[in-house]
Amino acid sequence: MSKDLISTDEYIKIKKKRKRIKKIVVLFIFLISILVTLCLKIPYFNIESIEIKGNVNIPKEIIKDSSTIKTGNNIFYTNKKDAIENISLNPYIEEVKITKKLPNKLEIYVKEREALFYNKVDKDFFIISKNGCLLEKRKEIKNMKLINLQGFEFNESKIGSALKAKDERGVKILNDFGVLLKNNASDVIFTQLDLRNLLDIRIYSNGICVKIGTSDQIEKKLNTAINILKRDELKKAKKGYVDVSYEGNPVFYIEK
């Protein structure tokens, strides 16, 4: 009998405890709901400033406008995914990150693609990034200091995408060259890269043809060629070649 009474008492206590917990949970949810509603409604969380970082050539206003985020919008309503997708539609944008700085600031960081190559098709210049992305078509390239590129299906390529090539290895080789040429700190200026034959790759410095051969050890071959091209007799040369395509001592020839 006493055991049954004790069990009943314990049951009542447990039931009361559960009711208290339930009330606390309901109250907590209610308070959270009020807090969320306030955050979404009060002006304290309205965006006051949008800071653009990382842009070099693309104006800040273009990035802001393409994001479709406006000052005055509630920071919690801001859809970062949509904004990133909108900004990334610009072919010159390689990467986008958006950070919310509570209570009312937004930071948009962009990494731009850099134009390095070009090819002329009919009256249009195709502008290409260092990693082989077609950035735009334009009518002139004055003062852009780009390298002429050969060996791709330019007319079949789409703006914002990698160049089309008959041999897919071409894009990878172009990317390798792009990194090396962008980091070239010497005074040697390259004017054309010919990837039409991947077994006989050639790069030109004005009238001097550098025979690279295959894509093996591109960095070593290019550095060797640069050191040769820095020699006085080659700086003055108008036509000739430097052959670094094979193992052993490189050969150069200056046309008289």
Curated annotation (Swiss-Prot):
Pfam family, one: FtsQ_DivIB_C
Superkingdom of origin: Bacteria
UniProt key word Transmembrane helix: yes
Extracellular side: 45-256
Classification via InterPro entries: Cell_div_FtsQ/DivIB_C, DivIB, FtsQ_DivIB, POTRA, POTRA_FtsQ_type
Keyword terms of this UniProt record: Cell cycle, Cell division, Cell membrane, Membrane, Transmembrane, Transmembrane helix
PROSITE patterns: POTRA
GO CC annotations, alphabetized: cell division site; plasma membrane
Annotated localization: Cell membrane
Keyword Cell membrane among UniProt keywords: yes
Membrane topology (Cytoplasmic): 1-23
Transmembrane domains' residue ranges: 24-44
Membrane topology note: Single-pass type II membrane protein
POTRA domain: residues covered: 45-113
GO biological process, one term: FtsZ-dependent cytokinesis
Signal peptide start and end residues: none
Functional note: Cell division protein that may be involved in stabilizing or promoting the assembly of the division complex.
Family membership: Belongs to the FtsQ/DivIB family. DivIB subfamily.
Annotated protein name in UniProt: Cell division protein DivIB
Organism: Clostridium botulinum (strain Loch Maree / Type A3)
Lineage of the organism: Bacteria, Bacillati, Bacillota, Clostridia, Eubacteriales
Gene that produces this protein: divIB
